Every structure is written in C-alpha cells, then in structure tokens.
Amino acid sequence: MANIKVAVVQLSFNDNEAENLAKLESKIIQAAKNGAKIILTPELPSYLYFCKKQNSKYFDLAKTIDESPIVKLYKLLAHKYNIVLPASFFERDGNACYNSIAMIDADGSIMGVYRKAHIPDGIGYQEKYYFSPGSAGFKVWDTKYAKVGVGICWDQWFPEAARVMALKGAEILLYPTAIGSEPHLPDYDSKDHWQRVMQGHAAANMLPVLASNRYATEANDDITATYYGSSFITDHTGDKIAEADRSGDDILYATFDFAELQQQRFYWGLFRDRRPELYDEIVRKY
C-alpha cells in the first residue's frame, strides 16, 4: 500500500490518569483526522513517569491487558478511526509486571503484546524494581498499513533489537519513550545522543523510525526530572524529516511508500551481503 501517513504525538502528563487519557484521545483524533494511519504516543503515557524511585504504591497502577484503561481507549479509537495504534501500558500478568505494548490494528483488535526486553536500572530510572523483562523476543506485526516493529525506550539503544525486527520483515520501527535529565548529572544532556542512536538504526536497516517522548518537569517521590521532548521521525537513511521542540504539545507527520522503500533495501544489498556466520560474538555474554 503506497503513501501511508504516520504521526508521532508529543505530550506532557500529570498524576491524573483521566486527564492524561483525555489529552491523548484529543491528539490521536486530531492526527487521524489529518490522515495519519499509524500513530505513536509516548511510553507509559497514562501517568507521571513513576519509576524515578522505588515505591510499592505504584504497583497498584498495573493492570491486566483486559483491565487497562488505555488499552480499552486505544481499541475504541483504532476501530472508530481505522488507525494502527500501539498502546503502552503497565501490565500485570499473574504475579509479574511488565512494561508492555499492545499492538492494536485498524479494526480495533489486539494483534499481540510486546514486553520491554531491556530494563534500565539507574538513578531516576529504577525500572528493574517495577518490571520483569520480556523474554518472548522482538516482534513485528503485519498491520493493515505496514509491517510494524516496536521497541520500548531503553530497547532503542540496542542495535541488535532493531536488526532483529528488520530481519523479521519490519517496514517501520516505532519507539515510545520516556527520557530526560539525569538527576545525579544535572548538566548532562543526552538528547542528541538519544536521537543519533535511532538515526543509526534507520540508516543501518534502511527503515523509517518514529520516536515519541514526553516533555516537561515532573516531581514525585522527592525527585525531579525534566523530560526533553524532541520527538522525531527519520526517513530510511536516518535523516530527521520531522522534529518536535524540547517542550510543547506537538504532532509530527510523514508519509512513506513502503513498497518503494523495500525496493531500495533490495537495491542497496545490506541484507543480501550479511555474513551471519561471522557474528557469533554478538550473542555472547562477556
């Protein structure tokens, strides 16, 4: 299918889930009415980023996929507006919790769930306390409009994940994100590095990349962090073709002909000339 319009939504969030969901709904509808068929929103957008510190009260936010308010909302919106809409949510499954994506196709059906594989554990990003790592591997979904691969935030720093999704047939890579300041390094700004690593995935795999980040300063549990927005879209060469500011609500748009991009990947020969027999070290633990 030629000329598919995609969108990236950038927003700020607070501690009121209903308000956050209303903001998301408004922007998703706006993007859909402007012709977007695949729409990406940030990581865990129902709440403030609660992983700054370890606090057991936040486990009350975890819901099963059937209970999750954001999954319910996104299913309704996907069906009504005929859009592909990945839903990032705090998933509870039995006694375990995950940082998950429910991939929702344009008919409102859930195609499957991806659970974040790479879980950070640093100052201001205490995710290992909250989330078990996903172990089912990286997934690509054959949606109505494109074959879509999704990594969640810290996954975006690992080229292996992007390459696996490309080898599984992904035509576009999506990265919902929550990234900003480092509380122990107040003068450090990772924004450019963050963008470049995903631009590299786009260029190395000749796939467009969408990255959606939250923005604004959030203070909870006696710790403050500023999320720097700067959401962006790249083309298949890694060139940024749309970018949001460090703050402010925004919707970014781009249009891709995925059949044409497939021909360019064939022409360039990156996958033809791979030498997997030489890459054993990549899968070893050192």
From Swiss-Prot:
Query: Which organism does this sequence originate in?
Result: Francisella tularensis subsp. tularensis (strain SCHU S4 / Schu 4)
Which function does this protein serve? Catalyzes the degradation of citrulline into ornithine, carbon dioxide and ammonia. Contributes to intramacrophage survival, in vivo growth and pathogenesis.
Spell out the reaction equation it catalyses. L-citrulline + H2O + 2 H(+) = L-ornithine + NH4(+) + CO2
EC number(s)?
Answer: 3.5.1.20
Question: Could you cite one Gene Ontology molecular function of this protein?
Answer: N-carbamoylputrescine amidase activity
| The protein's name in its UniProt record | Citrullinase
Q: Which PROSITE patterns match?
A: CN_HYDROLASE
* Biological process, per Gene Ontology: putrescine biosynthetic process from arginine
Q: Which InterPro entries match?
A: Aliph_Amidase/BUP (IPR050345), C-N_Hydrolase (IPR003010), C-N_Hydrolase_sf (IPR036526), N-carbamoylputrescine_amidase (IPR017755)
Q: Which family does it belong to?
A: Belongs to the carbon-nitrogen hydrolase superfamily.
What do mutants without this gene show? Deletion of the gene results in loss of CTU activity. Loss of the gene does not affect acellular growth, but it impairs intramacrophage survival in resting as well as gamma interferon-stimulated macrophages. Mice infected intranasally with the mutant show significantly reduced bacterial burden in the lungs, liver and spleen compared to wild-type Schu S4-infected mice. Mice infected with the mutant succumb to infection, but they survive longer and show significantly extended median time to death compared to that shown by wild-type Schu S4-infected mice.
Tell me the active site: 43, 116, 153
